[in-house]
């Protein structure tokens, strides 16, 4: 497990900090398959967005991603926005989730901070945890369960964003962001 953490840390530190600060981060675009098309799973979809909104740089959301719009490689990824469906309950729930992530990034300084590390708390190699810190020492934990097993969450903190989390167990493809 330790060697994987070294690889994760070294990938980020290979670049000068001024480069990391101005990264333009995107998960889908007019030239790529849409994010939802890759997973066909909302929990995995929101895991990816949680990473996007908590890493250094500027998150970029392609139109339609806020409603988990599907689309294969170009030109299918350039489908028209389904405006007639935007008010549906399902789409409004997805938009609300996106707003939560946007507000989290806006309101929690740690989400925008370039300072983070991988503490190696969990035995499961498919459970990714990183801690974001701001200049005052405030911290948030981002925990993603990409394994096929549920994970018992260690410690506690104020939950800022969660999917597939019951207060103790992080489910398969679950996401937890909390202030610690």
Language model features by range: what are they?
Residues 1-4, 8-74, 142, 146:
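Conserved alpha/beta catalytic core and glycan-binding cleft of carbohydrate-active enzymes
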Residues 8-9, 56-61, 65-180:
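Carbohydrate-interacting/catalytic domains
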């Amino acid at each position: 497990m330790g060697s994987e953490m070294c690889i994760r840390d070294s990938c980020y530190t290979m670049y000068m900090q001024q480069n990391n600060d101005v990264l333009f981060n995107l998960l889908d675009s007019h030239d790529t398959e849409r994010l939802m098309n890759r997973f066909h799973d909302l929990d995995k979809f929101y895991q990816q967005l949680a990473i996007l909104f908590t890493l250094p740089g500027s998150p970029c959301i392609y139109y339609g991603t806020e409603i988990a719009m599907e689309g294969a490689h170009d030109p299918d990824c350039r489908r028209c926005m389904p405006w007639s469906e935007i008010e549906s309950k399902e789409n409004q729930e997805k938009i609300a989730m996106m707003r939560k992530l946007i507000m989290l990034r806006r309101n929690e300084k740690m989400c925008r901070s370039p300072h983070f590390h991988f503490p190696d708390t969990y035995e499961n190699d498919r459970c990714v945890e990183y801690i974001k810190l701001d200049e005052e020492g405030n911290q948030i934990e981002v925990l993603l369960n990409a394994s096929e097993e549920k994970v018992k969450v260690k410690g506690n903190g104020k939950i800022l964003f969660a999917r597939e989390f019951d207060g103790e167990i992080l489910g398969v493809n679950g996401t937890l962001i909390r202030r610690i």
